[in-house]
Swiss-Prot record:
Domain of life: Archaea
Source organism of the structure: Archaeoglobus fulgidus (strain ATCC 49558 / DSM 4304 / JCM 9628 / NBRC 100126 / VC-16)
Coiled coil: none
Pfam families: Flavin_Reduct
The protein's name: Uncharacterized protein AF_1786
Gene Ontology terms for molecular function: FMN binding
Keyword Transmembrane helix attributed: no
Similarity comment: family membership: Belongs to the flavoredoxin family.
InterPro entries: Flavin_Rdtase-like_dom, Flavoredoxin, Split_barrel_FMN-bd
Length: 177
């Protein structure tokens, strides 16, 4: 077995890819692979966002965010949300996603996603060049991919295969936007 120092985070992939919605006046959507469950009671999750990201400033400003769960049918929008900058242009004009009113937070949810987890920030942890935003899940809406609150693995959830343009799903297929 080789031992060398490289980008060690590559060894954690593939990871599920989510859409993070932030902002109220001018909502923004970004992709994030670094989303993690943190607690059952209270229900908490964490999302690590780089300090330089526009989404970082929006979450700091409003204290809320939505974690949306896309399937592979949304891959082109997932790719655009992760490669365009909301600070430089209105991403929503480039995406074919529909923002809908959330139930418990001011930040909108995404109609086309199979689940939307509405979160209020309860803690921020500085972790080098990222902030781990700890969000209490206040409400969840879901589609058919989560009947009875459990994921249906017949739905192809987006997974980032590695840094870059390779994606996969919970199947063995590989996809590119």
């Amino acid at each position: 077995m080789r031992s060398e120092v490289v980008n060690m985070l590559e060894y954690l992939y593939p990871l599920r890819t989510y859409l993070i919605v932030s902002g109220v006046e001018k909502p923004n959507v970004m992709t994030a692979d670094w989303v993690v469950p943190l607690s059952f009671s209270p229900q908490l999750l964490g999302v690590a966002i780089g300090h330089s990201r526009y989404t970082h400033s929006l979450i700091k400003e409003c204290g809320e965010f939505v974690v949306a769960v896309p399937t592979i049918e949304l891959l082109k929008d997932v790719w655009k949300a992760g490669t365009l900058s909301g600070a430089k242009e209105n991403k929503m004009e480039k995406l074919s996603l529909t923002l809908v009113e959330s139930k418990k937070v001011k930040v909108p949810s995404i109609k086309e996603c199979q689940a939307n987890l509405e979160c209020r920030v309860v803690k921020e942890v500085e972790t080098g060049d990222h902030t781990l935003f700890v969000g209490e899940i206040l409400h969840v809406t879901h589609g058919d991919a989560f009947k009875d609150g459990k994921p249906d693995i017949n739905y192809k959830f987006v997974m980032h295969a590695s840094f870059g343009k390779n994606f996969t799903t919970n199947s063995s297929e590989r996809f590119e936007p």
